[in-house]
Amino acid sequence: MAKNKDDEESYCGGGGYWDMVEDLEEEICFDAQEVIPNLYIGSISAATCTTSLKEHKITHILSISTNPPKIKEFTTLCINIEDESQKDISSYFQQCHGFIENGRKLGGILVHCSAGVSRSASVVISYLMSVFFKPFWYCMQYLRNIRPCIQPNTGFINQLINYEATILKNQNVISTTTTTTTTTTITKKKLISNDCNNDDNSSGGSGGGMES
């Protein structure tokens, strides 16, 4: 049996064995899943797997943590908040959404907290709600299908439910505005069409048109 690393390298035909082991360890530590294109959610361990982050073309890391890892070579944002029901995580939604959107455009982004269960899940759910205009429970279930362990704490859930009301209200405003704009456009087209018909009727039969 191999007694040390050198013996194992000789036994396995070179250093490729240890490269394989390191790659496997890296893959195991990358505790993250892709939610939608270029957006990942995971635990703090995923944020330290530099090789895996680069392989997934991740350029931005959003840490929802009071003790974020020190990460180089990536664009980072840290939201210093504890996983406690009374903490106001919703006040950070807009800032996080902007950072996520920018990260997705420039490459990819990982959103993480400590275990990838409560804080990061709350932020990702809020982002899905704002982008797709979907209710909280829909986005929660969608994310849980991808990462089964997620479970925002009770306080965060209440904040997300309140945020849902804002999202749906904004959707109604956009829908109303779009409907009004469409109606106005159709009305204008009808008026123009009627004007053209009136002009044709008033000049019809004169035979004064130019011919090529």
Curated annotation (Swiss-Prot):
Keywords, comma-separated and alphabetical: Hydrolase, Protein phosphatase
Pfam families registered for this protein in UniProt: DSPc (PF00782)
Keyword tRNA processing: no
GO biological process: signal transduction
Gene Ontology molecular-function annotations: protein serine/threonine phosphatase activity; protein tyrosine phosphatase activity
A Gene Ontology term for the protein's cellular component: microtubule organizing center
InterPro entries registered for this protein in UniProt: Dual-sp_phosphatase_cat-dom, Prot-tyrosine_phosphatase-like, Tyr_Pase_AS, Tyr_Pase_dom, TYR_PHOSPHATASE_DUAL_dom
The Tyrosine-protein phosphatase domain, residue ranges: 30-169
Residue numbers annotated as active site: 113 (phosphocysteine intermediate)
Reactions listed under catalytic activity: O-phospho-L-tyrosyl-[protein] + H2O = L-tyrosyl-[protein] + phosphate; O-phospho-L-seryl-[protein] + H2O = L-seryl-[protein] + phosphate; O-phospho-L-threonyl-[protein] + H2O = L-threonyl-[protein] + phosphate
Key word Hydrolase present: yes
Class of this enzyme: hydrolase
Family matches, as Gene3D superfamilies: Protein tyrosine phosphatase superfamily
Superkingdom per UniProt: Eukaryota
Enzyme Commission number: 3.1.3.16, 3.1.3.48
Positions in coiled-coil regions: none
Function: Has a dual specificity toward Ser/Thr and Tyr-containing proteins.
Family per record: Belongs to the protein-tyrosine phosphatase family. Non-receptor class dual specificity subfamily.
Name of protein: Probable dual specificity protein phosphatase DDB_G0269404
Organism from which the protein derives: Dictyostelium discoideum
